[in-house]
Amino acid sequence: MEQEILRMKFVFDENKLKASGMTEDECLNIIRKYAFKHNLTEIEKGVFDSSDLDNTDPFFYIIMKLPDSKWFMKVIKEWTWYIENDIEDCIAAYYNAVIKNA
């Protein structure tokens, strides 16, 4: 049986970061500030983990708020949510929701 996890991973596109005048750390620091307030641990660069499998609210907040920022969707390359034994591509899910709600 696989170990259940609650984790979110962010990978930014270096070329898009340069074009927008941002750095990876600037982007991650915005996420880190929120994550640390909500008991999420950065287990490696850009990977945030919750030791409490019931602590999904911070992840839902990130999913709802980051795409609405002026910068996030322009520079994100990979955005993955590992919830228990499932893996969700948050970029694909976001664009699917946008298409459905258009």
Where are the regions that the model predicts?
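Generic structural motif
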Residues: D13-N15, L53, E84-D86
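Intrinsic-disorder-associated interaction segments
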Residues: E24, D52-N55, T80
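A general marker of short, structured functional hotspots
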Residues: L6-M8, I30, E44, N55, ...
